[in-house]
Amino acid sequence: LNWVLKLDKISLDRVAFALQMPSDSLRLTAFVNKAGLNNGLVDLGAEQYKARNFDITNSTFAYDGNYAAPEQGLDFSHIRLTNLNTSIDSIFYQGKEINAHIKEFFVEERSGLKVSALAGNVRSDHEQIDVPDLLLQTPNSEVRLTATIPWSSLEDHPQGSMKALLNASLGKEDLLIAAGSLPEDFKKAYPDK
């Protein structure tokens, strides 16, 4: 199809969505309190997608991959995100050409893990992916990433060299959430720093 859709402004207010696959335990739910997209373009013929900005405010998303009760801590079979807020500008996608400026991202997960900030740029061309400075913060941890990844290094027969600088300060509280169920004496003995 060679359709071109111009999306001047899309606003969602208080939209709920639920999906359960027949004969499967997969369940998805979402509640979008507010979401908006401005100056969007979907060009199906050129396979090009772009938007000036995309925002989500105070929304909730959940994924359950089975009927079992969630494990203590971070359980990838049961993800529940609340208080999701994000603001992304300069969005562009066409093949290997990608651009996004993440201005804001905040979310809380069922396990207690909180992302208090995620900001930075992600861009790529036909040669490589660039992450010039991505910052991830929780109330207890901070991670900074700078990376250059040639597309050729992701192929079946990799070529080229990835370059990445990762600086991280991980808080005890976040590590214990990620680890899940641990003996209390181990938790007490684990150093704070």
Model-predicted segments: where are they?
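N-terminal targeting/secretion presequences
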Residues: 1-193
